[in-house]
Amino acid sequence: MRWLTLIAVAHLIAFLSSAEITCPRIPEKCDCKISKSMIILSCNGEDVKTIAQTVGTSQIDELHILNGTDVKIESLPFNGLRTIAILNSTLQSFSPTAWRHVEATIEHITINGNELKTVPVFGNLSTLMSMNLNSNQISSIPDKAFNGLSALTQLRLENNAICDFPPKSLDAVKASLVLLDVSGNCLDAIPAQILRNAANLMYLDLGSNNISEINNFELMNLPFLRELRVQNNTLRRIHPMAFMNVPQLQYLYLQDNIISTLDGNRLQGFKNLEVLDVSNNALYALPSLKDLPNLKQVRVDGNLITKIETLAFSNNPNLQLISVQNNNIVQISRNSFESLDKLVVLLVGNNSLAKIERGMFDGMKNLQQLSIRNNTLTALDASSFAQLAHLTTLDLGHNKIHDIEEGTFDKLSKLFWLDLSNNKISGFKTSVFKKKISNILLDGNQLICDESFNEFLTYLIANKVRTFLPFQQEIMCHGPEKYAGVRLKDLMMKKANETLSEGSRLLGVPQGSNQHSLLSSFLPSLGPLGTLNGAGGAAIPLVNTLTNTIPALRSIPGFGGNIPVGTGASSVPNKNLNDAIEGFTGPLVRFATGGQPVASDIEQLIRSIPNMVVNVPGFGDIDLSKMDPTMIQYVLNGGQIPGIDKATLDKIVKQTMNKMHTAAAANLAGNPVEGQEKVLPPLDKLPSGLVTQVMSGEPLPGLNENQTKIIMEYYTHQMPGMDGIPARPVESQGNTTANNMFNPAMFDLLKMLPPGYNLSKIPMEVIAAVTRGEVPDMRLLPEDLLEHFKQHTTSLTSMFAGATAKNISIEEILEKLPVFVRPELSTFVPYDINELTSEMVLEQEQNERHRNIRIITAIALAFVGAVTVVVIIFFVNYTKKQRRLRKSLVYRSSPSSSGSSGQNAANESGRSSAAPSPIRPPLMNIPKTPNNRTMESTFGQPQLCSTLLENPQAVSHRSRH
């Protein structure tokens, strides 16, 4: 029966859990949604009475009312209500019995932004956990306002008019209270009586009041207090014995007060202290902050501190941030930051430091961010930051720096942000910058862009350094006079316009003049380009590409070989070419400093030839084998060549594609056309984006899918075979046994590559493994492709689709997968108390409550099981005792020892002689006692043991006697 009951209960629970939850009927101004099996009702501009009448007896879990019209609420007749929030309404009071209907269910109350004058009497709300009465007009608290709220853990009374607390107003909830927020009121002293002995209080906010001092013993016996906020008061003094038995304090916020002295020795009692903020006070000296093993952040901004003493922060092994900005610091003693191995941020901005002394920043070997902004520094040398090898951000803006010695930044290999804005820098000495720094901010300086500035300009271009932020004005030169007002990034292009001869020399046209301008020194690696050798741009790959690809361009001055060469030769200035040189300057400088051509450079170079008319008879005769792959990709992507309209260029592209198709078809048929290498360039001359497009099945411009397929088949046979040996030439179009590298697995690889990726960068071992259907070794891939797969890890699965079919073990697959190392974080995330919202605390409490329910359920089940075992044991023992009792009632005498009469003996003797029968002892002669009678009435006459045989004759004989 008991098992049937348990089964029935289980079925009932399953039925209830599977029942569909639906929203009830609601007023027009309300909205209903279901979240996490809870019915949430939100209303705007509605009163409680109307909502209750519409909802009726239906259950709702949460009720949110915005802009409500109630002035007084008489009743809350809602079934199952757990959360109520009345926001920005006109509510002034509650009836004493208003909460009676929800006493057993209500958990969270928020009455924020209303007109309450006093804390309502809530009654016996034994399940209430949080109460938020922020932003009302509460000025008084009844003595028994919180009686009956035995489970209350959070009480928020922020932004009211509370000037004092009755001594016993929080006695009913003191034992359970975890968070108390009374900030933004008019308290003039610590409410010690309501706080003392709050055994579970963890968060206390007394900010934005009128508290002037913390007296002795006012914060006493708070064993679990973790965070104390007394910011934005009129606090002048903290007495020596103010804190007693507050061992767990971690966060202490005292900013925006008028504290003039702070005894650091008293702070040493807080061994768990992590954050100390005494910003914007009146401290004349930095408090001694030593021997705080868990201290992570110290903020002493906005005080009157003039000096940081030696070992000011000693024995703080976990300190990560120090901020002493907005003080009057003129000196930082040597070893002030000794042994701060975990310090990553040091902010010393807005002080009066005039010089960085040797050893000033020693002891911070892992420092990453340093700000010395808005001081009075004038010079930097190699010893300034020598110990800061891990520095990534250095802010030196708004100083008076005019001299930076060579080697100042040599040891800062990880530096990527250097702010030198608003200083007195006019230029840089030789080799000041050797390693790449991605961002060097220079706005607000008086840069003199003379010849001594050339090396720095070359450094900026070669390393693609950003010199200003998007919202800042661009950097301008302030001298010499002919360069005044020239943008830094336009300087090289503007210099090209000053002399046509120098610009022509950059394009490979030798000039009779041997003049050297500023622009020539920008490009030392180009040097004199010598004679044209038949093509004006032969010494410059990009110009050579244009002139060899489009022969008609050679007729343009500066490009072709028809310009007179030799002594006395003269060239007529060409305005179009002058304008073009300015656009050419940017890409050419990058090439001159060791960079490789990229698509953006080609596009800039081509688009920088305004007003150049291209008259090209027979333009369609294009030699693709001499054309740069990037140029081909540029045109196929829709790029335009100045002087050629789009329709003409599209026609040329279509004609070229048709010629490619014709030549490929002829080659596959075994009849290659003459000069096919001009229209069918080798694979290394084709842009990788075009190869990927074709192999992915996308048609080429001007061709259909079948025509594109023929070109694909031609290039397929030009690819290396599976073993790295070039495939044999195709003898006939019908040959289907040729070695085809682009099998389905290879197509899958192409689809995973980034658009336009250069296939030549993929190792042949990987390609060969893919074409054979094997698992490739992904560790051999280049870094840029591994980074792409890191961002698209799902695409890696298709690489191993055939692994199962080939019986490849998981260990072999894992061995060939790349290892993505998690990057080291550059900084840490500071603690922010503002993230401690009521929802977070409530969520923690809800998780804790669920965990407790599970524990209680487990204990209850264990108890039931234990009781069941005890009952079974008791029943077994009882049964055994009954059996023993029955056996004890049996007469256990034998014939030789019986006390029977002679007649009985004779009868026994006669029966023995008459017929053999088993000997059966007579019944015991038990006297009739009250106990025996009771036992007899319960169990009947005592019987023999069931193992003995009953003799019918003996029974009848006894019955006659």
UniProtKB/Swiss-Prot annotation:
Q: What happens when the gene is disrupted?
A: Lethal at early L1 larval stage due to excretory defects. Maternal copy required for survival.
A Pfam family annotated for this chain is: LRR_8
Q: Which Gene3D superfamilies match?
A: Ribonuclease Inhibitor
LRR repeat placement = 60-78, 79-101, 103-124, 125-148, 150-172, 174-197, 199-222, 223-245, 247-269, 270-294, 305-316, 317-339, 340-363, 364-387, 388-411, 413-435, 437-455
Q: Provide the alphabetized UniProt keywords.
A: Cell membrane, Leucine-rich repeat, Membrane, Repeat, Signal, Transmembrane, Transmembrane helix
Q: Name one GO cellular component term.
A: apical plasma membrane
Q: Where is the composition biased (Low complexity)?
A: 893-902
Cytoplasmic topological domain residue ranges: 876-961
Signal peptide residues on this chain, from the entry's feature table: 1-18
Q: How does it sit in the membrane?
A: Single-pass type I membrane protein
**SUPFAM superfamilies from the UniProt entry:** L domain-like
Which SMART domains does the annotation name?
Answer: LRR_SD22, LRR_TYP
Which residues span the membrane?
855-875
Localisation:
Apical cell membrane
Tissue note: In L1 larvae, expressed in a subset of epithelial cells including epidermal, vulval and rectal cells and the excretory duct and pore. Also detected in some neurons. Absent from internal epithelia such as the gut and pharyngeal tubes.
Q: Which PROSITE patterns match?
A: LRR
Question: In which residue ranges is the amino acid composition biased (Polar residues)?
Answer: 928-943
Q: Any idea what this protein is called?
A: Leucine-rich repeat-containing protein egg-6
